[in-house]
Amino acid sequence: TGVQTCALPILGIDKRQYQQYTYVSHDHKESIDNSRRGGASHKFSKDNRVSIEAYANYHKVFREDHTLDAVAGYSFWQAGGEDFNMANYDFPVDGVGPWDMGVGSYLSEGRATMDSGKDPRERLLSLFGRANYSYRDRYMVSASFRREGSSKFGANNRWGNFWALSGGWRISNETFLRDVRWVNDLKVRLGYGVTGNNGFGNGYTTRMYKANDMWPTNGIWQPGYGSVRNVNPDLKWEEKSELNFGLDFSLFDDRLWGKFDIYHRKVDDMLYEVNAPMPPMVHDTVMKNIGSLENKGWEFELGGDIVRSKNFRYTSSLRLSHNKSKIKRLGDDGYFLDQVTFPSPGNPGTAVRLQNDVEIGQFFVYKYAGLDEDGKWMIYDKNNEIVPAVDGTKSNLVAENKHFVGNAIPKVILSWDHTFRYKNWDLSVFLRSWLDYD
């Protein structure tokens, strides 16, 4: 029946500074190899991060059986940095070290180096709220909403709305299980939610410039300036929606426990750096929202105290998981991305191709068909017919003759952990296994 409220502001400031001073003497091997009388360098960088968060909590129990918890708040995060580097060579004496940078002859000769830069400022602002309701700790409902704005996106797409709904039923608190003493906890849950992703570098929506090649201008070499990367003002939030069903249990005086989850995820407006035509673009890649990805799987965990005594405990837990991902849409029809280049020798090209309706993890390679009577390699072509890899001057090792084969992603990932505790001592053993993959 009581009501509890709490409001709390939080301010965080993180400032980091890095400085490095280096001097290489006249007699150092680097100076001798480059015919220089010493060398000095200064390196400086700093990183500034500010975070502000304010939120209010609300808690109320009414009619003894009903509990409501709620929180609402605001958060702000900002990051930025800068750096400066300089180097000079050929100093008259060693004794001054790196503290008289101007006397090195490389500066007067125009051969000293100096550069500086400033990171684009990044900001993230969030308004959020969450409410949890339970009846006798038996039936539970939760709802949350978050509105986030990120400076990484274009002016018209900076804000995204993300939400989640979930419900749970603690069956172990029902009257029909009250006398079943070996069941300590049994709960089923169902949830659906949408989250956003802005996990890529800054500066993809605003034109940035830097000095590059030197060009002669009126008899003087001057640096030319060019854009750092292609910009895309239409970038927007990548969104992941997930439907999840789960079961939690604890049995036999909490000596045996476990959980099972099955999920279906979909990612829309995937953020990816893709190839770009030159011209009209200046660089050969551009960040885009290019498609959607489907992800399905399950996870299972079973653990327990095998031995439990006053001074000694042996705990073991087993975890299994399965996951399958498929590209549902990737850019325009017929678009694909070739990745993971084979090492030399032979220059066999790439091993992976991402395209519509293809399961992630498959290899995209030439399919070996054996050797002919002369010992030459044979492959399956695009029509699945056996042809020589190289027929005289004609090579059949072309992309259209590649096939999707195998899969590098394991069908099941298994882990088995063991922990032994004796008084204040403990020993842990972790075993991992990847099953059924190519």
Task: Please provide the spans of the model-predicted regions.
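Structural motif
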Residues: 255, 424-426
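Oxyanion-binding "anion nests"
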Residues: 420-421
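Extracellular/periplasmic, surface-exposed regions of secreted and cell-surface proteins
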Residues: 1, 5-24, 35-351
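Surface-exposed, extracytoplasmic segments of Gram-negative outer-membrane nutrient-acquisition systems
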Residues: 218-228, 266-290, 325-409, 417, ...
